[in-house]
Amino acid sequence: MTKIAYLECPSGIAGDMCLGSLVDSGVPLEYLIEQLKKLEIQDEYRLWSEKVYRQGQLATKVHVELVEHDPSNHPSQNTHHHHHHHTRHLPEIESMIKGANLPPQSREWSLAVFRQLAIAEGAVHGIEPEKVHFHEVGAIDAIIDIVGTCLGLDWLGIEALYCSEMPTGGGTVWAAHGRLPVPVPAVIKLWESRQVPVYSNNINKELVTPTGAAIAVTLAKHFGSPPAMKVQKIGLGAGSNELPIPNILRLWIGESNNPDQVQQLSEKIAVLETQIDDLNPQVIGYVFEALLAAGALDVFTQAIGMKKSRPGILLTVICTPEKVADCQNIIFKETTTLGIRHRIQNRSILQREIQQITTDYGVARVKIASQGIGDNKTILNVQAEYEDCVELALKSNQPLQIIQQIVLNTWYHQNCLKI
């Protein structure tokens, strides 16, 4: 049977909550402590756990207690750390993980999570991931949270991880760069990278941290309802603050109900359509960019014949149901249409996974589409991320097609034994 897990995040997700849910699920804290010693930073922190109550519900709280604390000038209202006494660049962290002799799967997951987090922070600040120097990635507690979570999932033998929609939270929080709105910019970038479904539960606290978002965005195969599974254990990981709802991350652990069948994933999408016959064609390109920037999943046009024998176009926009109002506003504002049709449809999708590939010309992302899980997983398509390849081509003065082929060849070389 294929072992799977589902992260249910009604009150958000953070690294320490992930650790708590894993320990509550049966991962020995002593195992995590011994494995984490291989990072050779054990003198900088103490890892311990306790049982706590959140709105009357018993859960496990894992603490990453720093040996040396820097006093903060700005006490934070949020539940998680943003001020740390030790910062590191991404290459230093990657070198630390690679040299730690961790279990192979734990090592690869940890590297992928940190890379994804650095890409998000780099995008926020306009710098390359390798040059990111900020507290969230380099802090001891973030290292322990991420590597510890990957160790725990590996110890449980999880072959596929899924995640629920995420609450946005609200308010503001103090961070290394001053006061930031919640969700903080890095979290939004991470959500954007996987088009994570989000919602507001009207709680004005930081509910999703960059560390928690990076873990989910990197490791989860799909966001939404729980997959078909036989539930064997549910681990409860406690957050730090009391909230109007139990501040608990629930980790469902079990086996796939249909391990021999190809797992089909589906989601709800909105389709917007309008015919236009009196718009300057130059405006269409601008409308495309505006809609995609607003969160549209896809935008396209078709040539059509309209009344009075006029040539026109059918503008179609595909977006999540939550983005309908935003996309409609752009269409009304930027085009000459007087009406828009929209409908909700089911869309069957493949599982999508993003991996970071390092080549001689730099780092590029690769998107992998697959069906099934565990031993029944079949990779159907692999594509190099266009924007990343363009950037590498411009920097290296190499043809774009050559860069794309190098990225794909590198991925196939690294994964040929897994396919």
Swiss-Prot record:
Q: Which keywords does the record carry?
A: Nickel
Molecular function terms from GO:
lyase activity; nickel cation binding
Q: Is Glycoprotein found in the keyword set?
A: no
> Compositional bias (Basic residues) at which positions?
79-88
- Give the InterPro entries listed for this entry: Ni_insertion
Region of interest: Disordered = 69-90
Which Pfam family, giving just one, matches this sequence? Ni_insertion
* Family indicated by similarity: Belongs to the LarC family.
Q: Which PANTHER family match?
A: NICKEL INSERTION PROTEIN-RELATED, PYRIDINIUM-3,5-BISTHIOCARBOXYLIC ACID MONONUCLEOTIDE NICKEL INSERTION PROTEIN
Q: What is this protein called?
A: Putative nickel insertion protein
